[in-house]
Structure formats: C-alpha cells, structure tokens
Amino acid sequence: MAELLAIKWDDNRDKLILLDQTILPNKIEYIEYDTAEDVYDSIKDMIVRGAPAIGVTAAYGLYFAAKVAPEDNFKNFFKYLKEKSAYLDSSRPTAVNLSWALKIMESKALENKDKDVKEIKSILREEAKRIHEEDIEICKAIGENLVTLLKDGVGILTHCNAGQLATSKYGTATSPMYLAKEKGWNFKVYSDETRPRLQGSTLTALELYEAGIDVTTITDNMAAMVMSQGKIDAVIVGCDRIAANGDTANKIGTMGVSILAKYFGIPMYIAAPTPSIDIDTKTGKDIPIEERNPEEVTSRFGVWTAPRGVKVYNPGFDVTPHENITAIVTEKGIVYPPFEENLKKLFEK
C-alpha cells in the first residue's frame, strides 16, 4: 500500500487534500478542499483529526479565506480574516495547535500590512505551506528524542492515534516506533482500541501494521491486564494541549492509562510538539473539554448499541495530572518534573 498521509497539498491546483479518516480502515479515500467553510467541516466532522494535523489544516483554511477576502484595503481584508479565523478556531476547542496556527497566519498578515493585499494573500499561502513542512520536521525530532528513552525489545502501549495520521508525517507518539524500526529493533506495540471513535484500532493499528511494525490491538479495558503481565515497558501518547504545570489533555481514556502506568511503575511519556504547550493555561482545570455527539457512544456502524434516548456523557478528552507523567518529550528536548519550571525554560532556549 502507498504511504498513508493525512494531509497533502496540491501546489499546482491550489487545493488541500485530506485523507477521510472517518471511513478507515475499510476505505482509503482523499477529499479535496479549497474553501474555509469546507475546511471547518473537515475538522468538526473529524475527517482530519489529531492536534498537529488540525493546526496545519486550519492554516490552509485561513489561506482559502484570504483568497476571497476584500482587496480594497488592509483594514477590510484583516477584519474578514479575523472573522474567518475565529470561525475556524471554533471547530474544535481543545486542540491548542488550531489557535496556534491561526494566530501565526494572522501575525504574518499584520507583519505585511503595508504591502498590497494581493501580495499578502500570496504570503499567507507560503506561510501555510511552511507550517506544514515545519510539522514534519518537528515530528521527526520528537521521535529522535523519544527513542533515546527506549531500547531494543521494548514493549510499548499507546492510546488513540498520535501517529502519522494525526500529523503531517511520522506522528508524535509513533515517531520513535518508525525510527526504532529503521534501527532494526525488535519491539512490540499494544494499541488501545480507544472508545468511542476507535482511533487506536482503525488508525494506529492500521498505519503501524502497514509499516510492518509488530502491533497488537487491545480493548481499552485490557490495558491493566497487559501491564500486569509485564508486557509493557513504556506508555507513549500524544497530546492536544499541555498546561503550564504539565497537566495534559489528550483523548478520553488517557488519564486512566496514566493511573494504571503509575500503579505498575511504568514510565508515561507525552510526545508533545511545542505548539501543543500552552503556557498561558495554568492547569488542566482551565482547558476546555469538547463534548461530542451522544450517538458516538450509543451506535456503531448503523446499529444501536444502547437504548435509544438513554442519557449519554461523551467528553472527547480528559486531563492527565502532571504527577502521573514521567517526561514530556518535545522537538526541543526532554522535559522532566518540575514541569511548571522546566516547561518555561524550554521556551527560553
């Protein structure tokens, strides 16, 4: 099978091409986008998902908005751009990469406010492409730092999908797995199914399996059993937002995995691009948690799995307390506790 990439850019036709992740692993289909409104829908409906991939997608979305923005003067152009930026930012509130990418695009426009609006539009096009390329470099660097914490023969547990399908390439949590394979290591990955959207089984297992990596899918409630059997040496997950104190928002179920890892004395590593670290958010209590459609819990593949009308609580994310985390691994280096102090130092480098 050809390499699965979540995001592609067609430079000749000025189109964003996204892998439809809602139908994996049964079908592999790509959808083309060229409007901010359609990009909004792609993020909201989880055709594209994963904090880094969402950020890159939003940057292209704001470029599409810029293409049709007023050209009479910068004031009207930027007013329109700000409105569309807020619109795109509302698509999924938990992933900080979304607002990060949009702010970069806004800042780039402001930096060039004295130029002709048509020229600014071209500049924003190149900036979106730069954000895309930078994400690839960040993911590879995270993997290079993470692999130093592992060794040949390691057993790894991961939750949700912080893989190549959640980023522009390599992934964050999966990046060291690809690099370990390149080194010829013999290792095993256990991928939590990740209810209710099943990203662990439909996405992580798919991409690792296609890459020839030894991966075993387990249901979420099997994690404790696998840990108790000594099969797990490290837990590696991604993140959607990290607060200043190290509290980490990630896919629902991650907090439970961290509690189990702490009980069994297994290191818990967060693979984190620095854009996912939100120093302005003091603790996990300040992170907004998206609540999703109840039918994600009560039905699957067109079949009801619970009584119709039953009450449902369906948060998309939970927050792992910083005290359960062994290290936060970024493209700039490995951050150990105390996180509040050391995360600040990271941004001073």
Curated annotation (Swiss-Prot):
Among the GO biological process terms of this entry, one is: L-methionine salvage from methylthioadenosine
MF terms (GO), sorted A to Z: S-methyl-5-thioribose-1-phosphate isomerase activity
Q: What are the binding positions for substrate in this chain?
A: 49-51, 92, 199, 250-251
- Residue positions of the active site: 240 (proton donor)
Keyword annotations: Carbohydrate metabolism, Isomerase
Annotated EC: 5.3.1.-
Pfam families noted in UniProt: IF-2B (PF01008)
Q: What's the catalysed reaction?
A: 5-deoxy-alpha-D-ribose 1-phosphate = 5-deoxy-D-ribulose 1-phosphate
Q: Identify the InterPro entries for this entry.
A: Deoxyribose1P_isomerase_DrdI, IF-2B-related, IF-M1Pi, IF_2B-like_C, Initiation_fac_2B_a/b/d, M1Pi_N, NagB/RpiA_transferase-like
Q: Where is this site: Transition state stabilizer?
A: 160
Annotated metabolic or biological route of this protein: Carbohydrate degradation
Name the family the entry cites: Belongs to the EIF-2B alpha/beta/delta subunits family. DrdI subfamily.
Q: What does this protein do?
A: Catalyzes the isomerization of 5-deoxy-alpha-D-ribose 1-phosphate to 5-deoxy-D-ribulose 1-phosphate, as part of a 5-deoxyribose salvage pathway that recycles this toxic radical SAM enzyme by-product to mainstream metabolites.
Q: What is this protein called?
A: 5-deoxyribose 1-phosphate isomerase
Source species? Clostridium botulinum (strain Loch Maree / Type A3)
Q: Which gene carries the instructions for this protein?
A: drdI
